[in-house]
Regions:
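HDAC/HDAC-like amidohydrolase catalytic core signature
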Residues: 1-242
Length: 242
């Protein structure tokens, strides 16, 4: 297994008390080192995503607009939840770059599995809109661009989180070659695009407090048939953990 991260992902600053803060990644990396995981799987430095890959998913105007919003100092609110600091876009480019490099490593045979320890997250970022702490939709960018690699005809994105992966659905809803399975608490934020039902878009809403057994049953019932029908050449896990 390969593990990608980048020091600039910690440099994405947010207001004090914000739930998606640098401490999350700092503590994760510390735990990986203290438990010896990094002895077997040394941390690799994530490259930046290329503008061509971002534009292929989000469109050229969106990437440019994020650069325009980047503050030279302090913090800039994009919405009540989503903030930019001077190095936030750089962090997002490395986060997306980690996923894209991981895809290339797996497809190229370097390894079979890649874990990306990065921030800011991405699954709420829609085609032309940041939201929910997210700037670039790393997993959707990787999935969309992976389809241009010879031998990759189908991709599956499996998204588990307390929040629906609205951005990933938005970016992939018109591309039947990308299966998106998203489990989430409902009703809850963001309340967008969760009611789309297509063969390649599988939304699995769950009530608050759903236990592990019920979660596994829902995944087995909703996701496995779709995955087997889709026959993906590449699987991307979009892991929220909250």
């Amino acid at each position: 297994m390969l593990i990608y991260t980048h020091e600039n992902c910690v440099a994405h600053e947010v207001p004090q008390g914000h739930p998606e803060r640098p401490d999350r990644l700092v503590h994760l990396l510390k735990h990986l080192k203290e438990t010896g995981v990094t002895d077997d799987f040394p941390l690799k430095s994530a490259p930046k995503i290329g503008s061509a890959q971002v534009n292929n998913a989000h469109g050229s105007r969106y990437f440019f607009s994020l650069g325009e919003k980047k503050p030279n100092e302090g913090l800039e609110a994009l919405d009540p939840d989503t903030w930019m600091s001077p190095r936030s876009l750089d962090a997002a480019e490395h986060a997306a770059g980690a996923v894209w490099q991981g895809v290339n490593d797996v497809i190229g045979g370097t390894d079979q599995r890649v874990f990306c320890a990065v921030r800011p997250p991405g699954h709420h970022a829609e085609y032309d809109s940041p939201m929910g702490f997210c700037l670039l939709n790393s997993v959707a960018i990787a999935a969309i661009n992976a389809l241009e690699i010879p031998g990759i005809n189908k991709v599956a994105i499996l998204d588990f989180d307390v929040h629906h992966g609205n951005g990933t659905v938005d970016l992939c809803k018109d591309n039947p070659d990308i299966l998106v399975c998203s489990s989430f608490q409902h009703p809850f934020y963001p309340g967008r695009l969760h009611d789309i039902h297509r063969p390649h878009i599988v939304n699995t809403p769950l009530p608050s407090g759903t236990a592990g057994g019920a979660f596994r049953h829902a995944i087995t019932q909703d996701w496995w048939p779709a995955i087997h029908a889709h026959q993906p050449d590449l699987i991307l896990l979009s892991a929220g953990f909250d």
